[in-house]
Amino acid sequence: MKRVGFFYFEEKNNDCRRQRMMKVLIVIMMAGMWCMQPEKASAADPVIRVLLTTTDFNSRYHQEITVSYDGKEITYTAEEVKKQGDKVRIPAQKDGIRILSIQRQSGTPVYDGSIEIIPKAEGLIIVNELFLEKYLTRVVPSEMPATYEKEALKAQAVCARTYAWKQIQEQRLHELEADVDDTVNFQVYGNMEPQKAATEAVRETEGQILCQNGEDN
């Protein structure tokens, strides 16, 4: 397996360093110094599990959750979820699943993929399971304005994919049944709706991640 270079993300919360590194990554992208995802033998898009936080990204734990899908609106409390078993799972919907109890910069978020509502001692958690490439269409515009140059958006897409792939392998949120959360602790996800330019950047770099020296290990 190729070793992935994650130096960019370790300094992610430092805006100045982040901007400087983005310039370097754009040069890398333009030079073609990236590699394809090494584990795509089945050609299947990897799945990622995202822990969704409350409004303003304040907490991982929700006291009450209201969802809307397929013409239904349902509110869940911890007691109601426990009556139904270990968790409530809402399968993926054609028009997505809207979580009315959360607000983001773009308004009430709508999520692709499935939603799981899981009771914990501190409250309810929400896990959104979806394909990695779909996830990236809501990460890239949340992390970088979609008005940026195309190569910058493509570099951001590759970086975001690389980071997400690493988190899937590391399972840092295993106890919460997730790979990442939707905050700056990992990557901001779902704060903005998909934007055409950002989605194109994800599509044009599909499966590409950063590698260290392009060597297998």
Give each language-model segment a name.
Residues K2-N217:
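Conserved, single-site charged/polar hotspot
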